[in-house]
């Protein structure tokens, strides 16, 4: 942990003197970006959304092309911290090709209005049916079948949906009413 903190401090000190952008194709630069991302993920998983967001903001400054898709996790952080304005800024950087965006929009709508936005819900059910089934399932086992599927060369959509659930499960334990609202639409 101390190494990560020192590395972060070096990056911050350097960035105060001049603009620093790390090159994705440079091996050591990429390692720094990946380490910063992994640290942000660790903090996200333990519920330290503020530190996760700070690290992801730094990552996006250092890697403006967002090779690691930090915007997605940052949007989850902002929503968890109820930073709606920041969420509104970053959600446009989250690809609509992934279910994450619709889950984020559903959650944001639910937090703001107290109900699920019907347009997003309809798109979620139709376009990302496997994700809808996963997020409304009663159990989400990380069993041998799931592990084999997710580690294969071509993971199934169901395995990817389970992976997203498992990556964000700590959120849904805190905001269970959102998941209950989703389940009520089955």
Identify the function of each model-found stretch:
Residues 2-28, 60-62:
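Flexible helix-coil transition and linker loops at the boundaries of alpha-helical arrays
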Residues 43, 78, 109-110:
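Residue at a conserved register position within TPR or TPR-like alpha-solenoid repeats
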Residues 1-4, 49-57, 83-95, 115-131, ...:
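Alpha-helical repeat scaffolds
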Residues 39-48:
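Catalytic phosphate/metal-binding cores of nucleic-acid and nucleotide-processing enzymes, i.e., regions
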Residues 24-31, 48, 66, 97:
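Structural signature of alpha-solenoid helical repeat junctions
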Residues 105-186:
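Long, ordered, amphipathic alpha-helical scaffolds
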